[in-house]
Regions:
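Hydrophobic transmembrane alpha-helices and their immediate loop junctions
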Residues: 1-200
Length: 200
């Protein structure tokens, strides 16, 4: 596959992916603000300006590598990424346990809405007889990026959105049992990395 095809593939996915992760994070912060936490608002993160949300690895390197790999192989693969998490202080929420559910669900909910809007855009293009390859592929990319991002974030493992939703739904004791194994595993990984690191 030539360079022009790789560039076209990146161009097709760039806008949908940037919208997907930017609106996902902004939705978290906006709902948190509605529920009483002003942290994201005070730090200027309630904006659709993607520069405020870009994570060098999650927004650029990982999606870029996936897109280039997909283009070189000639096969369509899953493309996903992530942005810098919007800072949220759950203690500031008016009803932390219940509001945490709404704040967590806002991100995947925003992705679902975007997937629907990209689907509508695709249907409009087809109904108008517009079969321009670039725009059709962009709409399809918009649907796939948002569905993948929504599905990954709904996995019920903290600190993913699904984990926070489950934690908010469970009674306090069971919620801790849901969170504790993840924290223990993370601590174990950190200890492993430290023990494997050379002494300076």
């Amino acid at each position: 596959m030539d360079i022009s095809s790789i560039v076209q593939t990146i161009a097709v996915y760039a806008i949908p992916l940037i919208f997907a992760i930017t609106i996902h994070e902004t939705a978290h912060g906006y709902v948190a603000k509605l529920c009483g936490d002003q942290t994201a608002y005070m730090l200027g993160r309630l904006t659709l300006n993607p520069i405020k949300h870009i994570d060098p690895v999650g927004t650029i390197l990982v999606p870029g590598a996936l897109l280039i790999g997909s283009a070189l192989s000639g096969m369509s693969g899953i493309v996903f990424g992530w942005a810098k998490p919007v800072p949220i202080n759950f203690r500031n929420l008016r009803n932390p346990k219940t509001d945490m559910i709404w704040v967590a669900a806002a991100g995947p909910g925003a992705n679902l809405i975007q997937a629907i809007l990209w689907t509508i855009a695709l249907k409009i293009l087809i109904s108008m007889g517009i079969y321009e390859d670039f725009f059709i592929k962009m709409c399809v990319a918009g649907v796939s990026c948002n569905i993948v991002l929504m599905a990954l974030n709904l996995i019920p493992i903290p600190p993913l959105d699904g984990g926070r939703i489950v934690t908010g739904l469970l009674p306090p004791g069971m919620a801790w049992q849901n969170l504790y194994p993840t924290l223990t595993a993370a601590a174990g990984e950190i200890r492993s990395v430290k023990s494997a690191s050379p002494t300076v």
